[in-house]
Amino acid sequence: YVEEQLKAGRKRSTLEDYMDYSIGFSTRGCFRKCKFCVNKKYDKAFKHSPIEEFLDNDRPYLYLWDDNFFAYPKWEEILDAIEATGKPFQFRQGLDLRLMTDRKAKRFNNTNYRGDFIFAFDHIEERDRIIEKIQLWKRYSSKICKLYVLCGFESQDEKDIENTFERIKILMRYGSM
């Protein structure tokens, strides 16, 4: 497919994810059951594939599409396997900041992570917990942590807009944009 697209004149830069990255799931599942999430099939996170199963040694980078990596109790074993590849890696689904601990922040900030660390801030009701976890993260990282902001799902009225801007304001205050 990629070769066909290149021959048809598509720019390599638009296909680099498929050319430069080994892509797969090391874990699947999530316990949260968020209404907006497509993944409601599982009640917990579990090991899905060993890294070696989708690792292409000819590709310089690794993408992980895990649903909720931090919810998997043995996340550190998988992180060890990722690090053993020697390849820069990135989680593309976002990570669950609410599950951040000192150990997770320290480990992740001492890895060969490629790109931005991206988390989520879906509900204004979680503001105190999100602020606490951003501050925890910043104790270990000089890299900016960015957060997705969900809007327009539960409503599309002025309250939704107000909550969205309140979350953005919090993220701006903590340099997380």
Enumerate the predicted regions with their spans.
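Conserved SAM/AdoMet-binding glycine-rich loop
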Residues: 54-146, 151-153
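Alpha-helix N-cap and loop-to-helix initiation/capping positions
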Residues: 44-50, 125, 129, 156-163
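A general structural signal for short secondary-structure junctions and capping/turn motifs
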Residues: 15, 54-55, 110, 168-171
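Auxiliary Fe-S-binding modules of radical SAM enzymes
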Residues: 153-177
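Short catalytic/ligand-binding loop motif for oxyanion handling, primarily in non-cytosolic enzymes
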Residues: 32-33, 43-45, 71-73, 155-157
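Acidic, low-complexity intrinsically disordered segments
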Residues: 1-63
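Short acidic, gly/pro-rich beta-turn/loop elements at beta-sheet edges
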Residues: 18-19, 34-36, 74, 101, ...
